[in-house]
Curated annotation (Swiss-Prot):
Origin: domain of life: Eukaryota
Matches recorded under SMART domains: H2A
GO cellular component, one term: nucleosome
Organism: Medicago truncatula
Protein name, entry field: Probable histone H2A.1
Record lineage: Eukaryota, Viridiplantae, Streptophyta, Embryophyta, Tracheophyta
PROSITE patterns per record: HISTONE_H2A
Gene Ontology MF term list: DNA binding; protein heterodimerization activity; structural constituent of chromatin
Biased composition (Basic residues): 1-23
Record localization: Nucleus; Chromosome
Keyword rRNA-binding carried by entry: no
Assembly and oligomerization: The nucleosome is a histone octamer containing two molecules each of H2A, H2B, H3 and H4 assembled in one H3-H4 heterotetramer and two H2A-H2B heterodimers. The octamer wraps approximately 147 bp of DNA.
Entry keywords, A to Z: Chromosome, DNA-binding, Nucleosome core, Nucleus
Ranges of biased composition (kind: Low complexity): 131-142
Motif SPKK motif 1, chain ranges: 137-140
Length: 148
């Protein structure tokens, strides 16, 4: 056999052929989050002696869903405040106003998020008194200038 007639072995098989483009597990699962990296973290973290092949795919899908949910709500909060850019304040408002996400992230502090606006109902003026005082005040004000 001549060295010139030899073809390089590739993914095509024994005879060689064009090298096929590798397909990531994230692409196969239709995800944006990195399945391989999450699998590596699961192994490196020693959460269990062995990690199944489906575990990092499932975890990546769950993380991607949660991220998409938070971003969707934060984007809505930014639009409500007439802003084009999501800031930590919008993330906090989105998470705290959503019942399920608020329960999931109850013990989480979001840096530069601030607090939810809240006034205790006891401190607010009563509607009946406010309506009564506003109707009486203008009538007295109109009578007093006529004296002079």
């Amino acid at each position: 056999m001549d060295a010139s007639t030899k073809t390089k072995k590739g993914a095509g098989g024994r005879k060689g052929g064009p090298r096929k483009k590798s397909v990531t597990r994230s692409t196969r699962a239709g995800l944006q989050f990195p399945v391989g990296r999450i699998g590596r973290y699961l192994k490196k973290g020693r959460y269990a002696q062995r990690v199944g092949t489906g575990a990092p795919v499932y975890l990546a899908a769950v993380l991607e869903y949660l991220a998409a949910e938070v971003l969707e709500l934060a984007g809505n909060a930014a639009r409500d405040n007439k802003k084009n850019r999501i800031i930590p304040r919008h993330v906090l408002l989105a998470v705290r106003n959503d019942e399920e996400l608020g329960k999931l992230l109850a013990g989480v502090t979001i840096a530069h998020g601030g607090v939810l606006p809240n006034i205790n109902p006891i401190l607010l003026p009563k509607k009946n008194e406010k309506a009564a005082t506003t109707t009486k005040s203008p009538s007295k004000a109109t009578k007093s200038p006529k004296k002079a």
